[in-house]
């Protein structure tokens, strides 16, 4: 039993059969708010469309036509509503003395065990006995007996005795409101488990491979670890000191390049590049004013000095005159 049918109300149209009127029950859901349904009215064993039953909240309608009145013995009729309805019921077969009869129950989402305010001076149309709590009704239809079996509290019964023709089938219709997609999805979500355990994510071998691994530089020719093409010499303090001494006396290589390279454990290219960079740094500092201007040298003298140093390195070194005189002095002594 779903809770959507807790708030339901009953319609009791009058069906004429002989001299006695009978009531048939229809169960309507209260989710529609104000709804009008057509029912039959008693007029000389014929059904007409003069009587209407309107179920809603505080809405009353009465039938403008009144037919002849059949007297019945007043019998107590009580029932308990399980909804929040303000129902006005008026039937033409009960005559002028049977006016609008208000069934007022307090509005609430689960307003159970609420007895209807039925005036004893108005005779009912047929003997009807309601017992128990009408919650989640299950309709069972027979030709002579209609029963409501409560789902949660006890088993209440609505017993109806029909009079007259036995072949007349009393309509006991249950108005089932088709749920909207929103309600249907909500019910499916309620029926489904609250949370499903998700399987842990699998780690494959291809996911472990890094797309951009760090590049491992090879050890260069001069001990520099980096890109193979980028050759950069890291000079030691001793090498830098000796190179600065040579540069202080002469900004260009005067001694044999191979001799300087051999004494510093460097090659000739490294020494040449260092002197070139050192001269560029010297000129930059002079332009910035950090160092005094060095005596200007002719522009071609630099190249001539470099060329002469290269030639001297290629030819065997001849003894200088000072060294020769010193040698002669030592031999004479």
Swiss-Prot record:
Residue span of region Disordered: 61-82, 279-333
Molecular function per GO: DNA-binding transcription activator activity, RNA polymerase II-specific; DNA-binding transcription factor activity, RNA polymerase II-specific; identical protein binding; RNA polymerase II cis-regulatory region sequence-specific DNA binding; sequence-specific DNA binding; sequence-specific double-stranded DNA binding
UniProt xrefs under InterPro entries: HD, Homeobox_CS, Homeodomain-like_sf, HXA1/B1/D1
Superkingdom to which the source organism belongs: Eukaryota
DNA-binding region of this protein: 227-286
Cell location: Nucleus
Binding partners and assembly: Interacts with OGT (via TPR repeats domain); the interaction takes place mainly in the nucleus. Forms a DNA-binding heterodimer with transcription factor PBX1.
Protein name: Homeobox protein Hox-A1
Organism the protein comes from: Rattus norvegicus (Rat)
């Amino acid at each position: 039993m779903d809770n959507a049918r807790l708030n339901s109300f009953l319609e009791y149209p009058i069906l004429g059969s002989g001299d006695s009127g009978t009531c048939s029950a229809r169960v309507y859901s209260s989710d529609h708010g104000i709804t009008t349904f057509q029912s039959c009215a008693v007029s000389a064993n014929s059904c007409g469309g003069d009587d209407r039953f309107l179920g809603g909240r505080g809405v009353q309608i009465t039938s403008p036509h009144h037919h002849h009145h059949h007297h019945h013995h007043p019998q107590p009729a009580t029932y308990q509503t399980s909804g929040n309805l303000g129902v006005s019921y008026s039937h033409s077969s009960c005559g002028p003395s049977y006016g609008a009869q208000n069934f007022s129950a307090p509005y609430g989402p689960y307003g159970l065990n609420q007895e209807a305010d039925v005036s004893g001076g108005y005779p009912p149309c047929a003997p009807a006995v309601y017992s128990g709590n009408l919650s989640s009704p299950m309709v069972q239809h027979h030709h002579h007996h209609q029963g409501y079996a409560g789902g949660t509290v006890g088993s209440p019964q609505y017993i109806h005795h029909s009079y007259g023709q036995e072949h007349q089938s009393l309509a006991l219709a249950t108005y089932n409101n088709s749920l909207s997609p929103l309600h249907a999805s909500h019910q499916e979500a309620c029926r489904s488990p609250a949370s499903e355990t998700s399987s842990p994510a699998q780690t494959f071998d291809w996911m472990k491979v890094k797309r951009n691994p760090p590049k491992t530089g090879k050890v260069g020719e001069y001990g520099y670890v980096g890109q193979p093409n980028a050759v950069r010499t890291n000079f030691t303090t001793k090498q830098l000191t000796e190179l600065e001494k040579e540069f202080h006396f002469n900004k260009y290589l005067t001694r044999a390049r191979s001799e300087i390279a051999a004494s510093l454990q460097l090659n000739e290219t490294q020494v040449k590049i260092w002197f070139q960079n050192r001269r560029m740094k010297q000129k930059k500092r002079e332009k910035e004013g950090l160092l005094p201007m060095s005596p200007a040298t002719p522009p071609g003298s630099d190249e001539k000095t470099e060329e002469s140093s290269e030639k001297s390195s290629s030819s065997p070194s001849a003894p200088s005159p000072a060294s020769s005189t010193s040698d002669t002095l030592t031999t004479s002594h």
